[in-house]
Amino acid sequence: MLSPSKTVGEFTLIRHFQNILKSQAIPRGAIGIGDDASVYPQGKHASWLMTHDMLLAGIHFLPPQGRGWWELGWKALAVNLSDIAAMGGRPSQALVGLGLPDKLSPSGLQNFYRGLKACAKK
């Protein structure tokens, strides 16, 4: 059980969710929630690896100014690609989830996607 008076870290949360979800039916051969990625077999010789890391302003990065959005776009994809690589996978697709500040300029958003695209091409 989680204590409301205590700061909960990433790995404590993962273990907590694993305990809650352990009664869920997991497809044969699948590896559920963990630190890097979940594994879902797709036939005899292939699997899907799924991951999603969220970056929080003030924790994982300082709020960007100007070109900093490009670097943040790069980092947002790179942290997820590294999870796929850690599992021995090769990335083919990405899902982007954004929580944006009210005052984000259109050029900031463009720079974010340019950084993300540059990382994807690498």
Give, region by region, the residue ranges found by the protein language model.
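Extreme N-terminal cap/leader segments of soluble proteins
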Residues: 1-68, 87, 96, 114, ...
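A glycine-rich phosphate/pyrophosphate-binding beta-strand-loop-alpha-helix module
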Residues: 68-122
